[in-house]
Amino acid sequence: MEFLKKLEVWFVVGSQDLYGDEALKQVNANAEQITRYLNDQNPFIQIKLKPLATTPEDILSLCQAANYEENCVGVIAWMHTFSPAKMWIGGLTRLNKPLLQFHTQLNKNIPWNEIDMDYMNLHQTAHGDREFGFMVSRFRKPRTIVVGHWQSESVKQKLDRWMRVLAAIYDQQHLKVARFGDNMREVAVTEGDKVEAQIKFGYSVNGYGLYQLVNSINTVNDEDITALVKEYEASYQLADSLKDGGEKRQSLIDSARIELGLKAFLDKGGFKAFTDTFQNLAGIKQLPGLPVQRLMAQGYGFGAEGDWKTAALVRAIKVMSYGLPNGCSFMEDYTYNLDDNNEIVLGAHMLEVCPSIANNKPILDIKPLGIGGKEDPARLIFTSKSGKATASTIVDLGNRFRMITADMQAVDKPQDMPNLPVGHAFWKLEPNFDIGTQAWILSGGAHHNVFSLDIDADMLRTFAEYFDIEFIHINVKTELPNLKNELRWNEAAYK
């Protein structure tokens, strides 16, 4: 995630020449104070104050410059005074970077004894932002609105969350997804229009022959394998059979070789997300389990069975959640525990669940896999952390993409499962199992999802709004009749 260090958000403060030089100097000084403070809070992305926007020409120039500056990932607009919105028409019609309308003011409280008309003329966000907001709404332009004093914790958190979404948007627009093999045969939801995805999101999806990956695996040197195996030993609880001298030690070495070769291929090609499928493994000794788990933990996106849409979404949520403590993973609804009024979903996959969500030190073991026709693969075994969580997916409906996010509560495992050989999570659906499941299915939600313990639906809605794709949020207030109506309305709204 080194690319995050070079990103910046531009802070554009609106006013007008009507107020005179002295007032505008004070506006600029106040903007500098706010910028310094916010940057001192160690934001996810640095904020860069730009010259005051006081004329249509200034505003047009700023917006065009933001478009052309590669490292600028978004614009914060604040109307310190009244800034007539017709001045913003030229700039806003051209601005193609994410926009945040910052509805704040310098002083938290009214200076009751000192307030006069000079103060009133200078501190006009309350109506200046309404004028600006009208014009943005007139353009039907998506934006985020943050309301509150710039020193409040809630405002800082909202800005941080917005910046995290910006980083994911930027990354999607530069993302390359590598596919090894095609989709799992006869599966529908993992298919999709890769050309339309590149037009809509910006990422490219291309396929590569297994022989190319095999060549990369075969060129890995023994010294690097030895070093990686030592890293395994330091990071995980190794089963006895995988320890030095164990009967399955060679399989662990083979897995390390696959990991190094896979990573080398991805890095050489600039790929930050990838897919594979158990039906296309020619030349590879085992289905990559441990290698995929570890690469996801390093921030790569992944989708099993050729699921490139989920691979790209895993990467997006990895970027959004960089530095946060709880993790996210490729996931699949696998099976249920159907106690009355206490239904629980067991989420997992054949192998590929990211250890960033693990609640303890994972066990590294090799177990049989009765699918794929290859040698038994290495994998990390663990249970997920508990807490508020989301499951998200993007599906291709033929004429548009739809993102679906479901609120959930990840829970501790009810009982030990000594024979379950995969990483896994348990969760309860909102508003309950019945409605939550129906809502996902009615919305066309995939059987693959991105499970996150850090990123919530509001952030994902902002992500979807920027890309102008449909967003369905399943939550504690979801009612099926209302959802069915929303799905009907969206058929018209997103044509």
Swiss-Prot record:
Its cofactor is Mn(2+). Gene3D superfamilies: 3.40.50.10940. It comes from the Bacteria. Mn(2+) binds at residues 305, 332, 349, 448. GO terms for biological process: L-arabinose catabolic process to xylulose 5-phosphate. The keyword Isomerase applies. GO terms for molecular function: L-arabinose isomerase activity; manganese ion binding. Binds 1 Mn(2+) ion per subunit. It catalyses: beta-L-arabinopyranose = L-ribulose. Keywords: Arabinose catabolism, Carbohydrate metabolism, Isomerase, Manganese, Metal-binding. Pathway: Carbohydrate degradation; L-arabinose degradation via L-ribulose; D-xylulose 5-phosphate from L-arabinose (bacterial route): step 1/3. One of its GO terms (cellular component) is cytosol. The keyword Lipid biosynthesis does not apply. Its EC number is 5.3.1.4. Catalyzes the conversion of L-arabinose to L-ribulose. Belongs to the arabinose isomerase family. This is L-arabinose isomerase. It comes from Mannheimia succiniciproducens (strain KCTC 0769BP / MBEL55E). The gene is araA.
